[in-house]
Design a protein with these regions (language model features):
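Anaerobic metallocofactor- and corrinoid-dependent redox/one-carbon enzyme cores
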Residues: 7, 19-134
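Glycine-rich phosphate/ribose-binding loops and adjacent secondary-structure elements
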Residues: 10
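Short glycine/threonine-rich loop/turn motifs
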Residues: 13
Length: 134
């Protein structure tokens, strides 16, 4: 069972993983001011959210089924651990090497893969290298 509050992108990502594993889910798009508190800033953001939903033909506060979020099994869900969790190991570093663990789930075949990758940091873009160097 999965239960939580998050933004629309997080909801679609969760729906992709759940569908790929043969599960089911429902969701609702709720304006920010109803979830995060009725402040002036949250009302402004909520107004923009509602406008985006209306432009896409999505009704706010309407229950969305899994099929509304992810139309078919032609998908791949991918997640890489940043910090250690029950599901994935976080990034570990030893000198010039960083190790990551990624979960891949293919929807059509329900194939689940865990991939451990070793990254040579001096071969990465300078921005990534600087972040991981410290």
């Amino acid at each position: 069972m999965v239960y939580g509050i998050g933004g629309a992108p997080e909801g679609v990502a969760a729906a992709a993983a759940i569908r790929a594993l043969g599960g089911d889910m429902q969701a609702r798009l709720i304006p920010r001011n109803e979830v995060k508190g009725d402040t002036e800033e949250n009302r402004k953001i909520a107004s923009e959210e509602v406008q985006r939903c209306e432009a896409l033909g999505v009704k706010v506060n309407e229950i969305l089924k899994l099929e509304d979020l992810v139309r078919d099994d032609n998908l791949v869900f991918a997640a890489t651990g940043i910090t250690h969790s029950e599901l994935l190991k976080g990034i570990s570093r030893r000198g010039n090497l960083a190790t990551t663990e990624t979960l891949l789930i293919r929807g059509k075949s329900r194939t689940i893969r865990k991939i451990q990758s070793i990254h040579y940091l001096d071969r990465k873009d300078s921005e990534i290298y600087e972040i991981l160097r410290n």
